[in-house]
């Protein structure tokens, strides 16, 4: 949680806020099928619904009031993964900084699966 003191009091931003912003921003990028989560019981990777996108996001807080974001995603078959990942990093960093004022130290994109087209 990030806490900022002002002359009128304190502002705290919970990790769920960062997770929601990052998950939604990543989900809206071209080539991203959705956020991914690995089941702890069977080890399988599941595609998360848009309203659960924050479950594929982990946020780490640093002492210098910056954050690191880890995103677990599924991509569409045939996309250029480095280009999609770069787009995600730019989009998530922009949206998190714009919405919260917090500096993003790093964004790590983990491509957990590729969704094949159904025929």
Task: Give names to the regions the model predicted.
Residues 1-77, 86, 102-119:
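Contiguous, often N-terminal, cationic amphipathic patches that form binding interfaces
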Residues 81-100, 104:
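Short, non-transmembrane amphipathic alpha-helical segments
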């Amino acid at each position: 949680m990030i806490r900022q003191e002002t002359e009128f009091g304190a502002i705290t931003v919970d990790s769920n806020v960062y997770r929601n912003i990052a998950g939604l921003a990543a989900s809206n990028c071209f080539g991203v099928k959705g956020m991914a989560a690995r089941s702890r019981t069977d080890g399988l990777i599941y595609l998360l619904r848009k309203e659960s996108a924050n479950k594929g996001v982990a946020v780490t807080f640093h002492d210098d009031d910056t954050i690191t974001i880890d995103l677990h995603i599924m991509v569409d078959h045939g996309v250029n993964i480095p280009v999609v990942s770069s787009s995600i990093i730019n989009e998530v960093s922009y949206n998190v900084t714009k919405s919260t004022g917090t500096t993003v130290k790093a964004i790590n994109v983990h491509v957990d699966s590729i969704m094949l087209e159904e025929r």
